[in-house]
Amino acid sequence: MRYITAGESHGPQLTTIIEGVPAGLPLVADDINEELARRQKGYGRGRRMQIETDQVQIVSGVRHGETLGSPIALVVENRDFAHWTKIMGAEPLTEQEEKEMKRKVTKPRPGHADLNGAIKYGHRDMRNVLERSSARETTVRVAAGAVAKKVLAELGITVAGHVIEIGGVEAKETTYRSIEELKSITEASPVRCLDEEAGNQMIKAIDDAKSNGDSIGGIVEVIVEGMPIGVGSYVHYDRKLDAKLAAAIMSINAFKGVEIGIGFEAAHRPGSEVHDEILWNEEHGYTRRTNNAGGLEGGMTTGMPIVVRGVMKPIPTLYKPLQSVDIDTKEPFTASIERSDSCAVPAASVVAEAVVAWELATALIEQFGLDRMDLIRENIEKHNEYARGF
């Protein structure tokens, strides 16, 4: 599978075209809208989320609630475009209109794509950069991820994300009896945290940052249960599933680090305390005593839950802006202020779920793929039976 997105933050709409989704997948707009609504929630979001109520329109590739096997096109309208029609319109402006335009950006914000993108593409108005580099684009990435999640769910695979740290406040209680319990608890938490006490402290940290005109980041974790053994590859570096997952997490706006399983903690332990001992029983076949590898070894799945974490830096748009330089006058100035969140970590956990789900669904279709969901399901069932008795 593959997809491409298009659209600007304050343009008319966001669009994604998805290719390679098998025929026969049950899919309706509500499957996607539920994920879009989850992305818009979360403590610390800005005023933009009060304007937009994201709803998807499926314009191709689905008929009567089932995928056809042809490309799926999804559209999400930007309601805020009504206030930006002149500034973000496709038609040229008159000389007078250009002079009157008050939204030209010449003061790059530290931490954003503004300056680098303007230099790369030769834009004197950095709005041309920030409109596309905005995290608003993750709306349609979540939409694509919702389709991937639906593929996984049909194959008995569950994806759940949660927040384990915000602004230095770390969740202490991260145990759960089932992945469904994990989902239930985090959906009820304003910061998507399993630890209620830590969640309250996270809310306070967000409030403190907002009152100071600042922003804070954090760490999210995605857990996936139900993946078969041996998905991915050790044969080529670019087909290793852990490499693809790491790239997917790092592709999310403002993410600066990723780890799988115990991750960087492995540097502090001897090998005897890192590697997962292999067990076998008649009911389940091969399993592991521990899951320090996070469900991935040698670029392939082990059959244990996949555990991926990502580090999100504080959002660089600040209400007490940092020092910058005006690209027209070269004079020092405080950077431009754009409407923004004070913390987007809870929402980012939903985006992380989406990109992880996409990579796993793609890997499954590559390995077991045919053009129909029922045949893919049969292939996976045969593979699981084979692996149990191997």
UniProtKB/Swiss-Prot annotation:
Keywords: Amino-acid biosynthesis, Aromatic amino acid biosynthesis, FAD, Flavoprotein, FMN, Lyase, NADP. It catalyses: 5-O-(1-carboxyvinyl)-3-phosphoshikimate = chorismate + phosphate. GO terms for biological process: amino acid biosynthetic process; aromatic amino acid family biosynthetic process; chorismate biosynthetic process. NADP(+) binds at residues 39, 45. Homotetramer. This reaction introduces a second double bond into the aromatic ring system. NCBIfam families: aroC, PRK05382.1. This is Chorismate synthase 2. The gene is aroC2.
